């Protein structure tokens, strides 16, 4: 299924949800592009679309037994995770989107993001955050992923 097809199905599943916040019209498409790009780079399949509209447990992928939540943005100055939804043992990956071209910018543990004082960042809610220049390098996460795959053999 295409990114647009997955985004349309995801949008339809959220219809009427009080927890779904769309900050831009193509919110779901932006997220799908980032998730697909991460999956391609890391050799991981995209997970099923949660057509029930229920929370997906903030898990887009799993690496070495840890949840991975992909955060994609067209203005990727800071990795943002909504206050109350940031989990210490989750890996958050920041993907920047320039037009339709995604770039993996970095990652960080939720426990480090939780150390930030939440701010609104032009959103209707406050977010834990980390500037992109302070994120851990993607190559480090890739090395952990390769090691966990090798350990399974």
Regions picked out by a protein language model, each given a short descriptive name:
Residues 1-64, 70-153:
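Nucleic-acid endonuclease domains
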